[in-house]
């Protein structure tokens, strides 16, 4: 697995072993030196789990013993950084939860904050959030004022409802407003990485709580920083693709009087792995300037024959009365790791300020079958 090998491979496991051995030279490490032997065929997440368990086995005892070892390694070894931090922070959280005391919980939160700048502690903190969300959020509220931008980013990123690669925290999904005070404290942050996390966090909430997201974005636009408009656009991107009228209106894309000619497809049959070209013309037929958000939706065929919709950004435009916007776009069906294609009927539609055109169908041909008419 080249991707996993590059991030959590044999070399990283060896570096972690050396760092821990340097922190506890009197201890014989049995599990860490051979942990990488189990890496074959494992995903990145699974490799982190293997190293976490090896570290916990080699540093047995209470939470304080592990925390002291980790702090010593961090203080004395410049190589104690990068992807090895993932299993290290996982081990810290696991040992603290296992011990079950407020003192170990609070120190684990502090130690994650100390280490997050060396990679990120956003995955490990989920274990602590699941264990005691209220206590964790009280601590995280203080992080929003940290002079360290990595800690401020952790406050937002670590508490995202749908953080990629991370375990879910059920209460973050059932209580979506629980993290809004964190976002309120950070949306005007000086750090772009913090603001980007805030936008992604709010976008996560739009899956289940669109009204909360729109109301939060509206409050921010009422008390903005120079960067707030861009942050809100990113935070509302999913709602815009859904055609949510409140989100669109908040960004200035209200009802518009337009005529949409298209989409017109260049071909009705698309060879496997090729692309489809489509065109359209959007005309402002009203008496006032029209501000437009234009997307297109591809209805992909699933294995069971049903269709799933994916929306893609096309353009934003301001059209004077009578002015036209010409669309000319290609959509690729080349193989990618994030989507599996199935031959058969697909469809494509335009979406202008949330209003969709009727879908136009086309056929994605099976592999090896060419379209002789092309």
Regions found by a protein language model. Name each.
Residues 1-247, 256, 271-279, 288-291:
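Surface-facing alpha-helical segments and adjacent helix-coil boundary elements at the starts of domains
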Residues 258-261, 302-316:
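Short beta-strand and strand-turn-strand segments in soluble, beta-rich domains
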Residues 264-271:
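Short beta-strand segments of immunoglobulin-like
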Residues 283-289, 355:
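Short solvent-exposed strand-capping/beta-turn motif centered on an Asx-Ser/Thr pair
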Residues 291-302:
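Short acidic, flexible loop segments centered on an aromatic residue
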Residues 309-336, 364:
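A beta-strand/beta-hairpin structural motif
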Residues 335-345:
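Short glycine/proline/serine/threonine-rich loop/turn segments at secondary-structure transition edges
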Residues 355-374:
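Short beta-strand elements
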